[in-house]
Amino acid sequence: WIMGHMVNAIEQVDEFLNLGANAIEFDIDFDKDGIAQITHHGIPCDCGRKCTKKAIFTEYLDNIRQVTTPDDPKFREQLVLLALDLKLQRISSAKAYRAGEDVAKKLLDHYWQRGNSRARAYILLNIPLVEDYEFIRAFKDTLKNEGYESYNDRVGINFTGNEDLDKIRDVLEILGIHKQVWQADGITSCFARGTERLKEALEKRDTPGYNYINKVYAWTLVRKSIMRRSLRLGVDGVMSNNPDRVIKVLKEKEFADKFRLATYNDNPWEKFRG
C-alpha cells in the first residue's frame, strides 16, 4: 500500500493517485465539541509541503465516495484504502467519544449513504494516542445503534503516536479488538528516525497467534534510501509525499519480484503469508 500523505484538498486526490498512490491519508480537524469540520493539517507539517490546504469534511467524503464507486465518472480503480488521520490531540480527551459518534454518522451519511452507496474503499481510523480510545468505542457503538454494524468489516484501527506497543495491545484488549489492526511507525519527513520500534512491530506482526498487528507501515518517507530500508525490513505499506518515488523503488531489481501494489482484491486486514 502506497499512502499519499496529507491529501486534504479535493483537487489533491487525483494528483496523488496520478503519482501512483493506491491509498490516501487525510487529516480531520474537530471543533472544541468534537464535531468533525474540515480536512486540514495546519502548521507545522512536513518539509516542502503546504500545510494549509483544506476542504469541508462532508464535501470531501462526497467526492471520495464518487472516486471509489465503480461506474461513477470519477471512479479510480486503484484507490482502495482511506486513512483518516483524526486530530484528536487538539481537543479534550473527554470529547473523544463525541468525535467518534460524529465521524461514524458522517461516514454513514456521506460515504456509505446508509446502504445506498457502492463506494468500496476500506477505512483506516488513525488514532493519535491511546488515551483517545473512546473514539473507537463510540464509532463502533454508533454503527451498531444506527443499524449498520456490518460496516465494521470495512474499518480498521491504527494508533499513530509511536507509543509502547504493549500499551497499545492493552487498549485493544480493553476494546475487545483482535483483528483489523494496522501499526504505524514514523516521524515527519523533516527528521530522521531509527528502526528499533518498526522492527519490534514487524516482529509482533509475524508472531504466530499475535492478533494485535496485521499490517505495518512506515511514515512519512521521501528519501529513496529510507524507502529501500523499510521495504527490506518487510513493511506492508509506505506513507509518502512522493508516491512516484516509491513506485520507482518498487521497480528496482531488488524489489520487483518481492512486492507489488495492493489492489481491491487484497484484504488489508489479513496478515500477508509470503
From Swiss-Prot:
SUPFAM superfamilies: PLC-like phosphodiesterases (SSF51695). Its cofactor is Mg(2+). It catalyses: an N-(acyl)-sphingosylphosphocholine = an N-(acyl)-sphingosyl-1,3-cyclic phosphate + choline; an N-(acyl)-sphingosylphosphoethanolamine = an N-(acyl)-sphingosyl-1,3-cyclic phosphate + ethanolamine; a 1-acyl-sn-glycero-3-phosphocholine = a 1-acyl-sn-glycero-2,3-cyclic phosphate + choline; a 1-acyl-sn-glycero-3-phosphoethanolamine = a 1-acyl-sn-glycero-2,3-cyclic phosphate + ethanolamine. Keywords: Cytolysis, Dermonecrotic toxin, Disulfide bond, Hemolysis, Lipid degradation, Lipid metabolism, Lyase, Magnesium, Metal-binding, Secreted, Toxin. Binds 1 Mg(2+) ion per subunit. The keyword Transferase does not apply. It is found in: Secreted. It is an enzyme of class 4 (lyase). GO terms for cellular component: extracellular region. The keyword S-adenosyl-L-methionine does not apply. This is Dermonecrotic toxin SdSicTox-betaIIB1bviii. It comes from Sicarius cf. damarensis (strain GJB-2008).
